Amino acid sequence: MNRKKLSFIFLLLLSLNISAQLIVSEEPIVLKTKTGDIFGSLKAPNSKTPVPIAIIIAGSGPTDRNGNSQLTQNDAYKMLSDELFYSGIATLCFDKRGIAASQSAMKEESDIRFENYIEDVKEWIDLLSNDKRFSNIIIIGHSEGSLIGMIAAENNPKVTKYISIAGMGLPFDVILKEQLEKQLAGQPQVTKDLIFSYLDKLKQGETISNVPPTLNALFRPSVQPYMISIMKYNPQEEIAKLTIPTLIIQGTTDIQVPIEHANLLSVANPKAQKVIIENMNHVLKDCKSSDMAEQTPTYSNKSIPLNKEIGKVIINFIKN
């Protein structure tokens, strides 16, 4: 066989090997719970030695394992997990109970509690810790998932590192009051007082009866137990309990979670590393403006790539 043929065969084999490495290997995974199955996607690089695995926890609302919902289609979590995969880090993304494929794990809205999400993550940790393909477990929580993740990681020897992305730095009721204060501008004071009194009552663990129809969307009886359960937690107090390496990431053009929240979390856990990413918004995409008209396309266009810095920051933190 002449030298040209050998060179051609070598280049062909090399290209096939590179192509194989670029294909994301994804397998379905199921967590069995007492109330139903929770479905996820596991991406594990082909490796002869164990690799780290990151559990990515979605934010609030009907956001699925890829970062999408009926109103938003941005593939943020899918893009992040793919980037970690290419760097040799395995990932688990899952539909939280009651969401997408895991819909049946929540029979009724009134059944769900914030603690259910925490316990689910703990069970995922237990499941993955028995998989010999993985060397250590990292928790990545986005938005509301940040609080879920930090509580699940507390005093858990199976978790080696924790990452908060756009995490809340204030209790849920405080955030809700701040948002409503802006939305209720111009409304009668009596309306504002009534709404805030309802929030105070929920904070005390009390349910509200005879909610006016105009306020039913926010205070419907079926959602009150969940609101009571999440109001128990203060993110600053929870992140202060973490003794493992911790990374706090925040974008400068996030219109849902201001930078102040990252600062509050950082003060609460001084040993944590804080990274502020310029022009990154809440869905981890580039956006130079906080104007809604410019933000909207990043929430609903899958072709817009992930911010270039966030993957590098996370990979460096996990590997070092």
Which residues fall in each region the model found?
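N-terminal cap/lid segment of alpha/beta-hydrolase-fold proteins
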Residues: Q21-T49
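Conserved alpha/beta-hydrolase
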Residues: A76-Q103
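Short beta-strand/loop motif that positions the catalytic acidic residue
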Residues: L242, I248-Q250
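Catalytic active-site module of serine/aspartate enzymes centered on a nucleophile-bearing elbow/loop
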Residues: V283, K288-N320
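Short, surface-exposed "cap/lid" segments of acyl-processing enzymes
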Residues: K48-L84
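Accessory cap/linker subdomain of secreted extracellular hydrolases
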Residues: I163-E237
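Short alpha-helix in the alpha/beta-hydrolase fold that links the catalytic acid
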Residues: I244, V257-A268
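Alpha/beta-hydrolase active-site loop
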Residues: E109-N130
